[in-house]
């Protein structure tokens, strides 16, 4: 008997509505049932009943195998201004409510509070059912950040302005997802369009007889020619209208940098990602426009294309099964790489095949994130990255690298020097901030002012707004106590060039975190000019320095470098300070962690594919998997198509 026949079948899409109507009691006050993208929305004019009898929805989900959400009917919603006034009285003062956002498309109101734990407990003092019944809006409790994220504010404004358009779009997406299957058999293939045999422009097409899903859509910023810079969508043999969905694993440009171009040329379908990935990728994509313009290049997309992505994005939490096409379900799981990074688990057909795309993963816990998830019920095919896939790619343990970091910083501060840390704004900067805060509080690192500049503050605000995606201990600190490391007394954000004077004042030891991580532009260069000529100072590199970058030249021993001053003239900077490079803070798994991840999945796997690495490293990891685990392993090349089932 085939696997699909063995599984308990859910009702057909035509019978779903009838099943729901037959299962909901009259007391629930359901006024209408609509598709809302990949979900089915039940609208009610008596929200308390379903909120207090949530087993009704749970039982329905088990029967129909679809996501169901409860929405409050528009007829009982209070006007926003009235609801806001009521909330100001209903929310306990000690929760420190900072702001509200009303999403008219979904009927949800987000409450941003300094002490969200006082609102999440659903206590007698603050009952969600009571409040929702009074104001006619469903509640979402959010952590209010120390400084507001301008990126998230722009997203909220964009969502409000496009509310009617989004509502229509979500209904159309639902119609497309829940359309009848046409194929009576399964054929599944994966086509490599970028990021195979290389790092950069990650992109692939997952195809069945019923569906076409694009997974990641990145760029290769270092490539000299467009044919090497962008995904080879011309090889996919499809139009943008053929796509059922785009799925994004994480926010970095090598995975999302070409996504605005899809919007520019007419893609209007759903874009699935985790909630923090949306603001993170918008931040990075908009910054890429600024960088291209500053370098005299014409950006391949405009700000309006990034805003269009905001309208099309459907954000998903970890661990939630979501229909994204008639025959593909998606589950996102923690990848441990950067904020919101996700492994993508595709359940295809009626149990025919399960495909997991690792994206960029860190299979090791850090102070910022939990280790990548691995406990999938079924995985027949795994596609795994190989950034550090060579046998010699072994990183020190976190304990070792944090100890080395403490010693490097303490030594420079003890000599009366300044420590400049060139750093990427997303991920690495927040991890170093958490390490500094932790060890200064414990007394293992000398206390000194810590200055940050660049996009670090904005990226940190996005981290702070999504504590549920952080390591367990850090999440608990932010959500359940007043001890918020992102609001540490040690940190000062430099918002304007005039603010650098305090950090650069003579005889004042300090730590400076500034972008960019490779000394290729950004405010770090202004600090570099002042810090490099003095022997007591130190430049501490904690991220990879690519060949040809200023960071690599400095690390390799350059003693003089020409830089442009504010007047537009070239000045020579003498380098007398000390240099140090620390490995181990990487957001990628090393060789041992990659093979360890495969080991965890070994009993379920039938095939391993390898991507996202230099060809030599991808080949080495594939050979290691075959040798160590006796599992077929292959490292595809761009334009190759692999039959999965």
From Swiss-Prot:
Assembly and oligomerization: Homodimer. Interacts with RNA polymerase (RNAP), interacts with the Spt4-Spt5 complex.
InterPro entries assigned: aCPSF1, Beta_Casp, KH_dom-like_a/b, MBL, Metallo-B-lactamas, RibonucZ/Hydroxyglut_hydro, RMMBL, TffA_KH
The organism's taxonomic lineage, starting at the top: Archaea, Nitrososphaerota, Candidatus Cenarchaeales, Candidatus Cenarchaeaceae, Candidatus Cenarchaeum
Assigned keywords, A-Z: DNA-binding, Endonuclease, Exonuclease, Hydrolase, Metal-binding, Nuclease, RNA-binding, Transcription, Transcription regulation, Transcription termination, Zinc
Cofactor remark: Binds 2 Zn(2+) ions, which are required for nuclease activity.
Cofactor(s) in the UniProt record: Zn(2+)
UniProt region (KHb), positions on chain: 78-146
Region feature Beta-Casp, mapped onto this chain: 392-586
GO molecular function: DNA binding; exonuclease activity; metal ion binding; RNA binding; RNA endonuclease activity
Superkingdom of the source species: Archaea
EC number: 3.1.-.-
Protein name: Transcription termination factor FttA
Keyword Zinc tagged: yes
Functional summary from the UniProt entry: Terminates transcription on the whole genome. Termination is linked to FttA-mediated RNA cleavage and does not require NTP hydrolysis. Cleaves endonucleolytically at the RNA exit channel of RNA polymerase (RNAP); the 5'-3' exonuclease activity of this protein degrades the nascent RNA released from RNAP. Terminates transcription genome-wide in M.maripaludis. Restores wild-type growth to a strain of Methanococcus maripaludis depleted for this gene at 22 degrees Celsius and prevents transcriptional read-through. Transcription termination is most effective in vivo on RNAs with more than one U4-tract in their 3'-ends. Has endonuclease activity after U-rich tracts in transcription termination sequences.
Region (Metallo-beta-lactamase N-terminus), start-end ranges: 187-391
Biological processes annotated in GO: DNA-templated transcription termination
Family per record: Belongs to the metallo-beta-lactamase superfamily. RNA-metabolizing metallo-beta-lactamase-like family. FttA subfamily.
Signal peptide: none
Record-linked NCBIfam families: arCOG00543
Region named Metallo-beta-lactamase C-terminus: 587-645
KHa, as annotated region: 10-77
Binding residue positions for Zn(2+) 2: 254-255, 360, 612
Keyword Zinc: yes
Binding residues annotated for Zn(2+) 1, in chain numbering: 250, 252, 337, 360
Enzyme class: hydrolase
């Amino acid at each position: 008997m085939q696997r699909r026949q063995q599984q308990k079948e859910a009702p057909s899409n035509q019978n779903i509505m009838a099943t729901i109507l037959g299962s909901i009691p009259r007391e629930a006050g359901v006024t209408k049932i609509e598709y809302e993208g990949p979900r089915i929305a039940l609208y009610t004019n008596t929200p308390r009943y379903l909120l207090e009898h949530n087993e009704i929805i749970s039982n329905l989900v088990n029967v129909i195998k679809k996501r169901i959400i409860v929405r409050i009917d528009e007829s009982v919603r209070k006007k926003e201004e009235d609801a806001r006034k009521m909330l100001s009285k209903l929310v306990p003062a000690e929760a420190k409510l900072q702001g509200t956002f009303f999403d008219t498309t979904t009927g949800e109101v987000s409450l941003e509070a300094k002490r969200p734990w006082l609102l999440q407990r659903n206590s007698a003092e603050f009952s969600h059912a009571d409040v929702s019944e009074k104001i006619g809006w469903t509640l979402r409790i959010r952590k209010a950040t120390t400084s507001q994220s301008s990126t998230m504010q722009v997203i909220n404004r964009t969502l409000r302005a496009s509310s009617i358009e989004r509502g229509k779009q979500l209904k159309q997406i639902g119609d497309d997802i829940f359309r009848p299957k046409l194929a009576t058999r399964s054929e599944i293939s994966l086509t490599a369009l970028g990021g195979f045999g290389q790092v950069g422009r990650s992109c692939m097409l997952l195809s069945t007889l019923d569906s076409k899903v694009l997974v990641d859509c990145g760029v290769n910023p270092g490539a000299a020619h467009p044919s090497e810079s962008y995904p080879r969508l011309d090889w996919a043999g499809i139009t943008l209208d053929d796509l059922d969905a785009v799925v994004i694993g994480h926010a970095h440009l090598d995975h999302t940098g070409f996504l605005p171009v899809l919007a520019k040329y007419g893609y209007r379908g759903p874009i699935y990602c985790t909630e923090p990935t949306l603001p993170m990728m918008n931040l990075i994509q908009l910054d890429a426009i600024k960088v291209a313009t500053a370098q005299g290049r014409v950006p391949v997309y405009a700000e309006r294309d990034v805003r269009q992505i905001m309208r099309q994005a459907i954000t998903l939490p970890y661990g939630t099964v979501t229909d994204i096409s008639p025959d593909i379900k998606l589950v996102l799981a923690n990848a441990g790489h950067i904020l919101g990074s996700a492994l993508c688990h595709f359940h295809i057909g009626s149990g025919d095949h399960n495909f997991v795309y690792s994206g960029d993963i860190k299979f090791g816990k850090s102070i910022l994130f939990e280790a990548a998830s691995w406990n999938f019920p079924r995985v027949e095919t795994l596609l795994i990255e190989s950034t550090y896939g060579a046998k010699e790619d072994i990183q020190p343990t976190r304990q070792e690298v944090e100890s080395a970091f403490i010693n490097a910083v303490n030594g420079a501060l003890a000599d009366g020097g300044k420590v400049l840390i060139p750093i990427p704004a997303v991920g690495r900067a927040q991890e170093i901030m958490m390490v500094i805060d932790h060890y200064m509080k414990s007394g293992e690192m000398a206390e000194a002012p810590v200055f940050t500049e660049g996009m670090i503050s904005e990226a940190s605000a996005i981290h702070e707004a999504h504590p549920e995606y952080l390591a367990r201990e850090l999440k608990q600190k932010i959500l359940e106590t007043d001890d918020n490391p992102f609001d540490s007394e040690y940190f000062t954000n430099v918002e304007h060039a005039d603010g650098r004077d305090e950090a650069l004042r003579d005889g004042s030891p300090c730590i400076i975190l500034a972008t960019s991580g490779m000394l290729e532009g950004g405010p770090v260069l202004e600090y570099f000019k002042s810090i490099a000529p003095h022997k007591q100072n130190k430049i501490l590199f904690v991220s990879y320095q690519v060949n040809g970058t200023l960071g690599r030249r400095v690390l390799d021993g350059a003693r003089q470098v020409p830089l442009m001053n504010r007047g537009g003239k070239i000045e020579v900077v003498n380098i007398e300070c000390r240099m140090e490079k620390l490995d181990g803070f990487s957001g990628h798994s090393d060789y041992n962690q990659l093979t360890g991840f495969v080991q965890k999945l070994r009993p379920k796997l039938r095939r391993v594919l390898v991507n996202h690495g230099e060809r030599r490293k991808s080949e080495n990891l594939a050979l290691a998997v075959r040798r160590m685990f006796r599992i077929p392993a292959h490292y595809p090349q761009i334009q190759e198509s692999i039959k999965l089932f």
